[in-house]
Structure formats: structure tokens, C-alpha cells
Amino acid sequence: ILYRLVGSEMCIRDRIIRTGKNINLTILASGSEVNLAIETSHKLAKQKIYSKVISMPCQEIFDKQNKSYKDKILKESKNTFSIEAGSKMSWEKYIEKGLSFSIEDFGKSAPYKKVYDHFGLSSEKISKKIKFYLKKWQ
């Protein structure tokens, strides 16, 4: 049975997917990029860099939340990063200190993992850039 969803019913509220003690950073993602965020979080944890991963499938719902809720999600750590297999434009408003990993150029045709890797969207490349950022700006 398929149900017809209307308007905001299609948007699901954000979820904390991975967290722990001594959080150094927050990683925001949605859809298929959440798995990439989790892989990145695991790679960073092996280097004693701990992160919180947030699945945010509907920014419109998040934006309507009260300040204390948004602060709980975004302000627990000093640094916030986002992963998006499209434009970073919608994520930039959440990042005061940190980076957006995204694909700003188009026209590459290949299996998605090769395209992601070409644009730097692999857990290996993202974790290295995050580690470099933290060393440089902390």
C-alpha cells in the first residue's frame, strides 16, 4: 500500500544518528549522504576525533524549531561540517565554523562512488580535510 503524503508530511524531523562524549564536531547530512557521514565519523573516531552525526532530511522543519533545540543540535561542538552530493548553498546557514563538502560542478558521468571520489566525497578524503581543518583552526 502506498500512501499519498502531503506537504510537510514528506519531511521527517532531524535525528541524532551517532553521538558520544567529548564531541569535537558535528556532521550534518541527509539522504544517502548520511551513510557517508557515519563512515567519516568512524574514521575520525579511530584518530580520537569524536563527532555527532545529524540526519537532517528536512531543513524547513529544523528551521521552525525553537532556539534551544537548534542550539542542542548545532552548538554542542564548536565546528560543524556538512556533506551534500549537490550544492552546499542550503547548508551554509548552519555552519559558523567548519566546512561544507559538496559537488558544485556537474557533468561527470560514472558510477556514483567514482563521481563522489572525484569531487572529494569519500570518507577518507573528508576525514583528512576535517582533521587538517581542526589542526589549522583550533
What is the meaning of each model-derived region?
Residues 1-7, 11-12:
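Single conserved hydrophobic/aromatic residue that forms the stacking wall/gate
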Residues 29-32, 38, 53-60, 83-87, ...:
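Active-site proximal loops enriched in glycine and acidic residues that flank catalytic Cys/His/Asp
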Residues 23-25, 64-69, 107-118:
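Short beta-alpha connecting loops at secondary-structure transitions
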Residues 13-54:
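Long hydrophobic segments that form regular secondary structure
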Residues 82-138:
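Peripheral docking tails and interdomain loops at the edges
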Residues 55-94:
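Glycine-rich, anion-gripping cofactor-binding loops and their flanking helix/strand elements
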Residues 24-26, 51-52, 78-82, 98-101:
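Structural motif
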